[in-house]
């Protein structure tokens, strides 16, 4: 029974890879890059500890990494079209009307100055300013699983204002400066256009503080829970302070003690993550006629350690 299950599972994986290969294969005009693309995916899914052109080429039976390197650098194929294919694949197997779109960024440490977008900039991955590239990512979480959906490379202004440097790094002349939230907005729009079903958007303060991104969520019919800073201005909702504009921390500080409730935020690496939580209704900054929530999370061990979130739900749901 166990061996039969193992064989069936391996066959299912093989069938899945064949389906994926057929889905994206037409994006590669020649057989060589098409075969390397499939081998590259197999390598990424393998148990190889180090995954680079050398190790993936060796695994594919190539004597040199040239084929893999050409696939990633000079071969004529459009990664954005492949991304669109893969988003439709995600919809087929993971699509969920209650899905969550998660915006986040990560830093890739670099030593040189030639890699596209590399600069001395803050990296949340390192927790400090480093010479690095910053990628903004859109991921998807649903009951059936979770996966990456999209990506954008953040280009600091010093890059987009230096067209010669951009050309040397392979960045097109039509690429203009965009903030990280603007990159996130473009990815949300693409996911929507590709039919990715979702109910919620989440993101940290970099994205939550940007009102245009919150507007974009609402335009796309998406609810959100987005982190904001202590100095985020909100308009108090129904109650004694109704209509007053206050900082997020000031409005939460005005809540009576009984407002707070201890709830779990789920299990983490060190066990159950429990916090105190409080919420208060606020009027919309973007659409004053709408009603939203300001949510606060407080550490159980340090009551000065708080995080704030602006929340909005579509009419059929609850914030």
Cite the ranges covered by each PLM segment.
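Conserved, well-structured functional cores that handle cations and Mg-NTP chemistry
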Residues: 2-201, 206-223
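An anionic, glycine-rich sequence signature occurring as long contiguous blocks
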Residues: 18, 127, 144-165, 169, ...
């Amino acid at each position: 029974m166990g061996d039969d299950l193992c064989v069936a599972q391996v066959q299912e994986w093989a069938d899945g890879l064949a389906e994926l290969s057929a889905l994206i294969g037409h994006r590669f005009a020649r057989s060589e890059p098409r075969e390397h693309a499939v081998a590259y995916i197999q390598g990424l899914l393998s148990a190889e500890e180090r995954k680079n052109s050398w190790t993936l080429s060796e695994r594919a039976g190539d004597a040199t990494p040239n084929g893999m390197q050409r696939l990633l650098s000079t071969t004529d194929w459009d990664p954005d079209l492949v991304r669109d294919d893969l988003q439709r694949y995600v919809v087929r197997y993971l699509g969920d009307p209650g899905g969550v779109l998660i915006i986040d960024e990560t830093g890739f440490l670099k030593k040189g100055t030639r890699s596209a977008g590399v600069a001395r900039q803050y990296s949340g991955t390192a927790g400090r300013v480093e010479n690095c590239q910053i990628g903004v990512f859109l991921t998807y979480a649903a009951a059936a699983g979770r996966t990456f959906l999209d990506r954008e490379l953040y280009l600091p202004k010093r890059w987009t204002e230096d067209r010669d440097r951009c050309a040397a790094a392979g960045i097109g002349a039509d690429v203009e400066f965009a903030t990280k939230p603007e990159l996130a907005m473009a990815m949300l729009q693409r996911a929507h256009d590709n039919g990715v079903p979702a109910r919620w958007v989440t993101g940290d303060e970099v994205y939550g503080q940007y009102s245009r991104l919150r507007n974009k969520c609402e335009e796309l019919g998406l609810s959100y829970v987005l982190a904001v800073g202590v100095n985020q201005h909100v308009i108090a909702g129904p109650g004694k302070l109704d209509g007053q504009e206050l900082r997020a921390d000031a409005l939460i500080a005005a809540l009576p003690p009984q407002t707070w409730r201890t709830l779990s935020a789920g299990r983490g690496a060190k066990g159950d993550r429990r916090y105190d939580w409080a919420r208060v209704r606020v009027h919309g900054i973007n659409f004053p006629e709408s009603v939203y929530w300001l949510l606060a999370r407080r550490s159980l061990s340090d009551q000065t350690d708080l995080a704030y979130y602006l929340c909005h739900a579509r009419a059929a749901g609850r914030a």
